[in-house]
Amino acid sequence: MVIRSVRHRGLRRFLEEDDHRGIRRDLINRIRNILAALVAAEDMSGVAGPPGWRIHQLTGARAGTWSISVSGNWRITFDLEEGQICNLDLEDYH
């Protein structure tokens, strides 16, 4: 899937320049693996990750937003629009 827009400044820098500033050092490898899986997949059914990623769609006010667990309360979240990843974010929404 194509990543169309990124909300988190550090995550954007990481994707565009491989610059880790703005991302906790202990999360970098896990984030790299998650992003690689998302880009390699044609759709969400093709995202193969370990059970610890806990891939799911949010409900309530954020219904339709996808979430993938990074570590502790940290999540990669994004929306899918026309098969493209939008509003990619790294956040603690708990």
Predicted features by range, described:
Residues 24-51:
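Short, solvent-exposed, low-complexity loop/linker segments
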Residues 1, 9-10, 18, 42, ...:
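Residue-level signal for pocket-adjacent positions within structured domains
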Residues 59, 66-94:
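Enriched for short, Lys/Arg-rich terminal
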Residues 42-66:
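A short, surface-exposed loop/turn module that caps and links secondary-structure elements
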